[in-house]
Amino acid sequence: MLKKTLILLLVIAVCIPSLSQMMISHPWQGRRVAYFGDSITDPRNSGSKKKYWNFLQEWLGITPYVYGVSGRQWNDIPHQADKLQKEHGDDFDAIMIFIGTNDFNAAVPVGEWYTESDERVLAAVHEPKAIVTRKKRTFIYTDSTFCGRINKAMALLKKRWPKKQIVLLTPIHRAYFYGGEKNIQPTEEYQNKAGEYFDKYVEKVKEAGNIWAVPVIDVNATSGLFPLFDESAVNYHDPDTDRLHPNDLGHQRLARTLEYQLLSLPCVF
């Protein structure tokens, strides 16, 4: 009897991992994903041979539609969306947006999400209906501020593809970058020309999730990429001149983080 029990337990131990793999299917497996962004997404950027979306393509079979362009800021998202629509229409599953670090570097003012005004509106709360005066928030759509740019982009995407999943990624930590005598970017320890620290822009992307009802993956926190220390610069293109762009190792780490974070999000509805 003991021998049979041991054999049964051994069979169960061998089969459980296989059964769990069969039962758990990644929701982004085999999907078609459009990637909007900047140089970290741009396949032409020389900081790495493989980007995070290349790894996701290998691991999950995702078909990537890549529109990220080096140097771009949030005000370029509508242009990238237009290219996606022209090339694929509605024939894709989700959009991932990974942008914002260049807005910080360009010292784009952070701005506000809304204006407020006193407006007259019909209301009834356990009493007869009446026209009352209340504060009203109105979205600010402008290219002159970071929040206004996000509002413009998200309004366009929400109206154009209301059924699609849209995922925002926060910008990741950044350190020294030398791209020539007219392109020297200090570490995030310094404010930009607008007097703002980098994390203010990260926080605004996180706020956008609640404002626009889209999931945000905080890769600034979860990826572990931290180029400010020499010991961590192993994940970046060049420890001496480029701690802005992850290298292959950094992109792999970023992609692995996304692989697991995306397990909790539907790709299609």
Predicted features, each with a name:
Residues 10, 14-18:
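Hydrophobic core
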Residues 9-10, 78, 155:
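A periodicity- and composition-biased signal for non-globular, repetitive helical segments
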Residues 20-70, 75-90, 95, 230-232:
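Serine-esterase "nucleophile elbow" of acetyl-processing enzymes
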Residues 13-14, 48, 175:
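Alpha-helical transmembrane segments and their juxtamembrane interfaces
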Residues 15-16, 50, 115:
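Hydrophobic alpha-helical membrane context
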Residues 6, 25-27, 56-58, 158, ...:
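A generic structural signal for short, solvent-exposed coil/turn residues
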Residues 59, 81-269:
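Alpha-helical cap/lid subdomain in secreted, periplasmic
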Residues 1-5:
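Positively charged n-region of N-terminal signal peptides that target proteins for export
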